[in-house]
Design a protein with these regions (language model features):
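Extracellular glycan-modifying ectodomains
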Residues: 2-355
Length: 355
């Protein structure tokens, strides 16, 4: 490819030392090379003022995502060394405390970190991997896997999509990530919604509707992803990306229900294909797919900003306006991009759920 040589040249100029905590997890040579390459690409993008990095076959990658994957361990003592946040660098205390507060209210938290694109499609951005068709992509984000294990040991229910996304990254309705956008695709959302619904349906309180309540129909759309707008002026803009989305509810998308026992909260991964406008469509996002899978409407608290702290501040303010807001909630799904563990400049503040 030529990209490997360029990556090593940038690496030689910009190498800043060993990744924090990397000695604690033994990386295979190919994974170590992958981390070095994408770290170099991220630094090169930062130096040129670009936020998007072009990969193979029309795939575009978000430079902060590449940086996040390359820094190694990102919690505990390592957090302050690798986080973009000035305060609240460590996500671990905030997540564990949030789970504790919800648990005390009888609410079950499902943590849903969305795998970053490069962790599922490493062969599209690095020479370190050649993925054989039909086989699972090797795990290149072992630090995520370790972090989720630590969270589970502390009582947090983590839904790690990575094994399924890496094994089934090509679906009959397209790839699980958008080529030109920072978000997951319609196919990825449907897969995640099905896995979430399986967990919720197994809970004692849940009673499935007797008949399906919402129509579902796949259709093709064209989008110009947010990463296209992040390319340098010299880069040639690719043609619009064609995506298949599963639209829910026929002529009318299902409405969000504030009294639903299921609250979906998080960053724009909760809003893409749901809110319309520059998020591309309505009626085909995660809230819509969850509603279709469960047969009941869900509540939504999404933000276009960081899903780390801002959305929990929004929850606190909602509870301040209505002290009974959480009274009927059974499940909170906290969904955000996994890169937020290091790339959220707001950090991970420990906050009260309600006044």
């Amino acid at each position: 490819m030529g990209r490997r040589l360029a990556g090593f040249l940038i690496l030689g100029l910009c190498l800043l030392g060993l990744r924090a905590g990397s000695a604690e997890i033994e990386l295979s040579p190919s994974v170590e090379l992958f981390h070095e390459e994408i770290g170099a690409l991220a630094r090169g993008a930062a130096e040129s003022g670009a936020s998007a990095v072009a990969g193979e076959d029309g795939w575009l990658f978000f430079a902060p995502e590449l940086r996040h994957l390359s820094v190694g361990r990102f919690w505990g003592d390592a957090a302050t060394e690798v986080s973009r946040a000035g305060q609240g660098a460590d996500a671990l205390p905030a997540i564990v405390d949030f789970n504790r507060q919800l648990e005390e209210r009888g609410i079950h938290l499902i943590l849903l970190p969305v795998p970053v694109k490069a962790a599922v499609w490493p062969d599209k951005i690095s020479d370190a991997f050649s993925v054989e068709e039909g086989k699972a992509v090797p795990r290149v984000d072992p630090y995520h896997e370790e972090f989720y294990r630590v969270l589970r040991e502390k009582g947090v229910d983590v839904l790690d999509l990575s094994p399924v996304f890496r094994k089934q990254r090509h679906t009959e309705h397209g790839p699980v990530h958008c080529r030109q956008d920072t978000h997951w695709s319609g196919a990825g959302i449907v897969k995640a919604a099905g896995m979430l619904a399986d967990r919720i349906r197994a809970m004692d309180w849940f009673a499935s509707p007797e008949e399906p309540r919402y129509e579902r129909e796949w259709d093709e759309v064209e989008i110009t992803g947010d990463l296209v707008r992040m390319l340098t002026e010299e880069a040639e803009a690719p043609p619009p990306e064609k995506l298949q989305l599963r639209f829910v509810g026929g002529a009318e998308a299902p409405e969000v229900d504030e009294e639903s026992p299921v609250l979906l909260m998080g960053d724009s991964h909760c809003l893409v294909f749901h809110s319309g406008g520059d998020l591309h469509a309505t009626g085909a996002g995660l809230p819509d797919q969850l509603t279709a899978e469960l047969g009941i409407p869900v509540d939504l608290m999404g933000t276009r900003g960081s899903g780390s702290t801002t959305v929990r501040v929004d929850l606190y303010r909602r509870c301040a306006r209505d002290s009974d807001y959480l009274a009927g909630k059974k499940v909170v799904i906290w969904c955000f991009t996994a890169r937020a563990f290091t790339e959220s400049t707001q950090g991970w503040r420990v906050l009260p759920v309600s006044p």
